[in-house]
Amino acid sequence: MLTRSKHGIYKPKAIQVQVDYTSQEPPSFSIASKHPQWVAAMDAEYQSLQKQETWSLVPLPPHKNIVTCKWVYKLKRHSDGSIARYKARLVARGYLQQFGMDYDETFSPVVKPATVRLLLALAVQFGWELRQLDVSNAFLHGILKEEVFMAQPQGYIDPAFPKHVCLLHKALYGLKQAPRAWFERFTTQLLHIGFCASTADGNLFILRHDSCIVFLLLYVDDIIITGNNSKFVTSIIKQLGMDFDLKDLGLLHYFLGLQIDYTSSGLFVHQTKYATDLIQKFGMTDCKPCKTPSSPNSHLLPNDSPLLSDPTPYRSLVGALQYLTFTRPDLSLAVQQACQHMSSPTHNHLQAAKRILRYLQGTLHFGIAFTPGPISLSAYSDSDWAGDPMDRRSLTGMVIFLGNSPISWSAKKQGTVSRSSTEAEYRALASTTAELYWIRMLLRDFGIFLPHPPLLWCDNVSALAIATNPVFHARTKHIEVDYHFVREKVLRRDVMLKFISTHDQLADLFTKSLPSPRFNWLTSKLMWKFPTRLRGDERHHNATSNGCPEHTNHEEEDGTPTARTPTATFHKTMSCSVIRKHKGRSKQNATVPH
């Protein structure tokens, strides 16, 4: 058999590229050990571990599970992207732990996004100073209850005892029970100095002393603290600093990827840097922006194209997009659709996820704003009946406002198949009512008692009739549980139901993939564009001409709720002036904390 000659065919030579790991995170210890900045960071981490007596060296015990560890490197950056410091962290390989031997309980709660947004809104309303705290090596404050043995860290093996292992006393990062141990340790100390946990969210802590009140919000080791007396807040920070290695980062500007900007109108919260980094990570920097995050009237179907050979990039992208919905309600529906195909993503699903990135490219500076005004709750509830062509389950969409500001929203598939559009709308009403009731409980923990029930706007007359008329018949008896729940809240005046036209239904944004004119109109009612004067480019022209945001709580001046349809409401503008104190806030519509 004749074969083709290999004359003139050569193996390509690998091109050696020098990577500057002083501006990038090294992937391994061998690379990091060649750069003095990262060596200094590892030395600082190791000394901190030794100072806190994280472990003691013991001979290798027989028949015990040994967990290894590794160094993880992170560049800590300022909100503008510049390098703040080099961080090296020793992390245990917790996936090597064995249940019942070296770990048991692992659950640790985190604060709900709506709680964060509500705290920011109330801080603007009452002029509370928002301060940010960070606990260095937070997990190391947690005390382990189980025996955990770990191999000595690479580069720091004791020459006198090279065969010994580390018996851990503190909850090192990476251990399965580390977050729980830290949460128990910190909350125990908070309760000791007088804080009490919110009944609505266990990560919100409240301290009342005479006329002073302090609110502390905990998200793992990141903390927001605020209150009506700055000196008293400072004293609490000093008291906590006596028990933990606490850093007072000053005024809140950057929290969990959220950028908080201060204007004369209040706060503007956005994730511009996070979105920019995400677009760059997936190589979409030069992509052409599109007007909507999903194609109008489109549905993502399983097995509609070949499966991805590696689903990891898709899952990583959708997970990152899911976090962007913290300040981007306009992404909720598109991300919800993408999340349904995590197990078996196809090429079409990946293209749909990349379309969201294209939409982000054109709307990088969008976010939500918190401005002072009358305190009232209003909500919008909608559903897309049998919208999923595969299982014919309906979709619930809702958005809840505190005054002018959206504080909670969602696009979620209903758990059961609805036999009629009325049933789907009624189940959406029940879900929105439950969320409203929870937010009202949260407001009470803040010391705020609303004089009027929240308004819940629905565009289905039949669903409203079921809620207000105690009549059962063959078509509604199977939704009896939801019926009793909503009916009870209406009778107790925990919520007031009102009809709204489909055109004015803001929750429509969360139930259907809309054409760009309708989508942009609804988005303009929920979101603001970052004041361009603060960015240094041309001024953004807002929808309103008078420069003042219109009321969104549908109340008359005396606070009495009305059935006025909000066709012209939610037109928002944001002043671009420098920071200054808010004056003349309206507080007449609620009993507020002092």
Stretches with model-predicted labels:
Residues 28, 37, 41-44, 114-118, ...:
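Acidic, Ser/Thr-rich intrinsically disordered and amphipathic helical segments
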Residues 61-67, 123-127, 359-383, 450:
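Structured nucleic-acid-interacting core domains from mobile-element enzymes and related host factors
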Residues 254, 341, 374-376, 394, ...:
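RNase H-like nuclease module associated with reverse transcription
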Residues 28, 34, 44-47, 51, ...:
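Alpha-helical coiled-coil heptad-repeat oligomerization segments
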Residues 1-245:
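Metal/cofactor- and membrane transport-associated sequence elements
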Residues 114, 120, 172, 177, ...:
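C-terminal reverse transcriptase regions that engage the nucleic-acid substrate
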Residues 4, 29, 42-45, 49, ...:
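Mobile genetic element proteins and their domesticated derivatives, centered on retroelements
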Residues 89, 93-95, 321, 380-422:
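RNase H-like nuclease fold core
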